[in-house]
């Protein structure tokens, strides 16, 4: 028995060494696998950063949507009557033409009936323009201003050496704005033959009306 044990001793030692080596390799592999796996805390941090970024983007989109909606609602309130206002301006134009068709002499010598009719038409015109103004429609007053193609439509030139070139000197048809938009440009006559306009900062039509 002793001889057999002695005889098998080296083989047993080699087997044990191989087993230990295999175990060590397995442990090393296990350690390496654990090392390759990401840290749960780092994963949570990355996930938190991603969620925060998504939240900020969503908040920005919601804020932009809110602003855009507010602007669209404001525009809808301001400009929803634009089509109706244009139709009413056509009626107002007809009232003005009717009044302008009556000569000063006819007005001066008019009987009570004609005088009452004229006053009624004038009152109707004023009431209509006042109603439009309450809805944001304002009349342009371009006489004396420098011609501005954004608000005026030049119909003819008037020789005039007393005022700078391109000064509005006559209004053929009144112009109107609604909010910050031109509802209808004023049809005007502009001066020609005068001195060149002085280069200076000119307030916009809206600024002058608001002053």
Swiss-Prot record:
Compositional bias per record (Basic and acidic residues), positions renumbered to this chain: 33-43
Keyword Membrane part of the UniProt annotation: no
Region described as Disordered: spans on this chain: 1-43
Keywords, ordered alphabetically: Chaperone, Cytoplasm, Stress response
Biased composition (Low complexity): 11-23
Gene Ontology molecular function: adenyl-nucleotide exchange factor activity; protein homodimerization activity; protein-folding chaperone binding; unfolded protein binding
Listed Pfam families: GrpE
InterPro entries assigned to the protein according to its UniProt record, in alphabetical order: GrpE, GrpE_coiled_coil, GrpE_head
Gene3D superfamilies registered for this protein in UniProt: 3.90.20.20, Head domain of nucleotide exchange factor GrpE
Compartments reported by the entry: Cytoplasm
Biological process, per Gene Ontology: protein folding
Single GO cellular component term: cytoplasm
Main location: cytoplasm
Subunit structure: Homodimer.
Task of the protein: Participates actively in the response to hyperosmotic and heat shock by preventing the aggregation of stress-denatured proteins, in association with DnaK and GrpE. It is the nucleotide exchange factor for DnaK and may function as a thermosensor. Unfolded proteins bind initially to DnaJ; upon interaction with the DnaJ-bound protein, DnaK hydrolyzes its bound ATP, resulting in the formation of a stable complex. GrpE releases ADP from DnaK; ATP binding to DnaK triggers the release of the substrate protein, thus completing the reaction cycle.
Family: Belongs to the GrpE family.
Protein name (record): Protein GrpE
Originating organism: Rhizobium etli (strain ATCC 51251 / DSM 11541 / JCM 21823 / NBRC 15573 / CFN 42)
């Amino acid at each position: 028995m002793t001889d057999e044990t002695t005889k098998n001793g080296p083989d047993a030692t080699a087997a044990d060494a191989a087993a230990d080596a295999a175990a060590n390799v397995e442990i090393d592999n296990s350690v390496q696998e654990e090392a390759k796996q990401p840290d749960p805390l780092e994963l949570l941090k990355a996930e938190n950063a991603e969620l925060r970024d998504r939240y900020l983007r969503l908040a920005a989109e919601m804020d932009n949507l809110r602003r855009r909606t507010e602007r669209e609602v404001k525009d809808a309130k301001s400009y929803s009557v634009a089509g109706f206002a244009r139709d009413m301006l056509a009626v107002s134009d007809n009232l003005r033409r009717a009044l302008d068709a009556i000569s000063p002499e006819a007005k001066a010598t008019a009987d009570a009936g004609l005088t009452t009719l004229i006053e009624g038409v004038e009152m109707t015109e004023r009431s209509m323009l006042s109603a439009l103004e309450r809805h944001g429609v304002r009349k342009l007053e371009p006489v004396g201003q420098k011609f501005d193609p954004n608000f005026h439509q030049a119909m003819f030139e008037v020789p005039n050496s007393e005022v700078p070139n391109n000064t509005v000197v006559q209004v053929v048809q009144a112009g109107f704005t609604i909010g910050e938009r031109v509802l209808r440009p004023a049809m005007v006559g502009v001066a020609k033959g005068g001195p060149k306009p002085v280069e200076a900062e000119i307030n916009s039509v809206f600024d002058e009306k608001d002053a």
